[in-house]
Amino acid sequence: MGQSTLIRAKVGDRFSIGDGCPLTLFGGPCVIEGEDFSLKMAESIAKVCDRLGVQFVFKSSFDKANRTSIGSFRGYGLEEGLRILERVKTELGLPVLTDIHESQQAATVAEVVDILQIPAFLCRQTDLLLAAAATGRTVNVKKAQFLAPWDMKNVVNKLRQGGAENLLLTERGSCFGYNALVVDFRSLPLMRELGCPVVFDATHSVQIPGGAGDRSSGQREFVPVLARAAAAVGIDALFMEIHENPDQALSDGPNMIRLADLEATLRHILRVREAVAEPIGASA
């Protein structure tokens, strides 16, 4: 990647993420928990981001297809979930992001959302990647917990061959034995060398997969620590799942941050990012 080439991804016609752009937050509850709650959370997070000059994309899932237990809450489903996301988008004027799990979902979801997200477990699924690319929407791919950062070049190549122009790559931790994740921060500059802005998923990186037996656990107290470390290394966007009361959340509560803690967390991250203020790269 030539030094004169700007690394950016567009979020529709709203703003860009990458070189020379403000920090972007992908944030919201893990799963859609209702219409009023989604609107309330989106509006509250947006106000924090506006105060801090952070670009904001609302994130929430219509279906959690890979829950640990068959009895766990999965979501409102495709039709109702998209209707709620569309309300967030139109009534609050916010870009929205959600994940897809099957190739046939891509075109339908792309009619509503600004960013299609590919879950980490599915990031090598060629048909899913090509379907997402064919929509013309920006695509955010989470690096699988079992993949090396340099292996993401094959994922990027699939998407580009499929016609995708605006790509983002997300680090969300790597397997560290059983029921544990660890973050190798080298992955951020290494993935950015593929020509894509990079995102750090601070909340899933503290997840303890299957740590509570029939569900995953997590250590939300380490979210700010890892997020500041990522900001020091260099990131274009930050992914954090946020809830008014994480202990009552219907999915991933142990690793979501409290809405009340969001502003202070972002302020610390912005200070670190400003202090570093140099290009991201493995050779920097």
From Swiss-Prot:
This protein's name: 2-dehydro-3-deoxyphosphooctonate aldolase
Source organism: Synechococcus sp. (strain ATCC 27144 / PCC 6301 / SAUG 1402/1)
A GO cellular component entry from the record: cytoplasm
The keyword Ribosomal protein is annotated on this UniProt entry: no
Pfam families: DAHP_synth_1 (PF00793)
Compartment(s): Cytoplasm
Gene3D superfamilies: Aldolase class I (3.20.20.70)
Alphabetized SUPFAM superfamilies for the sequence: Aldolase (SSF51569)
Family annotation (InterPro entries): Aldolase_TIM, DAHP1/KDSA, KDO8P_synthase
Listed GO biological process terms: keto-3-deoxy-D-manno-octulosonic acid biosynthetic process
EC number(s) recorded for this UniProt protein: 2.5.1.55
UniProt pathway annotation: Carbohydrate biosynthesis; 3-deoxy-D-manno-octulosonate biosynthesis; 3-deoxy-D-manno-octulosonate from D-ribulose 5-phosphate: step 2/3; Bacterial outer membrane biogenesis; lipopolysaccharide biosynthesis
Location (main, coarse): cytoplasm
Gene name of this polypeptide: kdsA
Keywords assigned: Cytoplasm, Lipopolysaccharide biosynthesis, Transferase
Ranges that cross the membrane: none
Class in the EC hierarchy, top level: transferase
Family (UniProt): Belongs to the KdsA family.
One function term, GO molecular function aspect: 3-deoxy-8-phosphooctulonate synthase activity
Catalytic activity: D-arabinose 5-phosphate + phosphoenolpyruvate + H2O = 3-deoxy-alpha-D-manno-2-octulosonate-8-phosphate + phosphate
